[in-house]
């Protein structure tokens, strides 16, 4: 290519003198040749190129001399000639100096615009196309995008095989896996028809349309199997579509005994590739290059179904775990509700017990008045119903002590008690306004045996037995048996009065203490003590006058219960 001839129309060659001294030899003056590209159908691109673009196969050359007699159709060029391409971006026009157009080119000052040398990125910005991320798509050569021409191989960076930043998309299509560069998933790609391989099939190589110069990614040559290889039918892998040459090629490898070695090498390469992806995934976040490698390997070897199967298995496991989690959560909620209910019941029971404990104890009812009870030996005689209660009249004189008040004795019941210790004969008395509550029989102080009987509480004497009196002599006989009696009616607390009366009484006297029951008519006289003194002497006779006497109680034991 050093002495290649460029065949272009005469009017399409523009010679631009470069900066130099005017006095120098014109033959040594460097010139710039601006090539107007024309459609060329040539060589191996005839089968796949239908875009009518020209193939540039020119390096930097210098015209040795230009003479008037030399035909312009044949220009001999050398390395001193500088080639420039007219480019456009929107409405702006500039010249791309190819010798300065080195990889990666985005920030390299290789565009001459308004007599200024600027970078392609700056040129796109001045042209108002800065919104486009890919500067190669914004710049056009002869109406064709610069990227498309570079992908098709019509133009490339200057000395790209020697100077490469590894941040570009190489347009040198090396079919060797070690030198292949992987595209980034998700970017627009264009399919470029490459030369026919040895087996006669046409290989499609997916080239990304998105530039990676700005991203600054460094593509490692170890990322093998990054280029998706397919037949012209796409991803069909049926053995029927394999050409005869390909079949013979692999059959020859098997015949010479290299198949095992080839398979082992391929396996090692793939394992190293995947191992590198795993190591990078541990050390750093997942990168775009790793995603590209995995995607290409999966598609190349048809492993997408395996990947989907793994995803389905994980999805099923997650769903089962979610169901188990929901079941456990429901069971825990149920247990929580039961515990809350039990705690509430326990709290109610505790409150009830506390209320019972703190409840004030009710005061016991006052004891009832003791009742007279008859012993088992007591003989109860069933009396005939009396027509009238017997009336007894005391004929003997009754004297009243000064401390008392005089009152009528007509309605006072009188009891004739025996002085003996036991039994005591009690005659029935008529009911009246005053009832005996307490009766005390006090014997003489000189008596050897105590003859004191206390009858209480405040209840009238019960009639235990009664017998009809035969005649009045019985009452007289009983009267003769009674020693002089003093009747004392007093309230509780006046015990001293009883003692005084007892001390002043004569020998053989009997004192009866009478506490009358409450009388509504006698409320105004409450609190007054009345002492009734009756002296019954042995020589006096008591005559009992009664209209009817049918009942009599004698020889009766009186049992008194105290509180």
Swiss-Prot record:
GO biological process: regulation of transcription by RNA polymerase II
Binding site for DNA: 129, 133, 136, 147
Localization in the cell: Nucleus; Cytoplasm
Residues annotated as binding Zn(2+): 103, 160, 164, 168
Main location: nucleus
Disulfide bonding pattern of the chain: none
Keyword entries, A-Z: Acetylation, Coiled coil, Cytoplasm, DNA-binding, Metal-binding, Nucleus, Transcription, Transcription regulation, Zinc
SAND domain location: 72-156
PANTHER family the record matches: GLUCOCORTICOID MODULATORY ELEMENT-BINDING PROTEIN (PTHR10417), GLUCOCORTICOID MODULATORY ELEMENT-BINDING PROTEIN 1 (PTHR10417:SF3)
Function summary: Trans-acting factor that binds to glucocorticoid modulatory elements (GME) present in the TAT (tyrosine aminotransferase) promoter and increases sensitivity to low concentrations of glucocorticoids. Also binds to the transferrin receptor promoter.
Subunit-structure text: Homodimer, and heterodimer of GMEB1 and GMEB2. Interacts with TRIM63. Interacts with the glucocorticoid receptor (NR3C1) and NCOA2/TIF2. May interact with HSP27 and CREB-binding protein (CBP).
Protein name as annotated: Glucocorticoid modulatory element-binding protein 1
Organism: Bos taurus (Bovine)
Gene it is expressed from: GMEB1
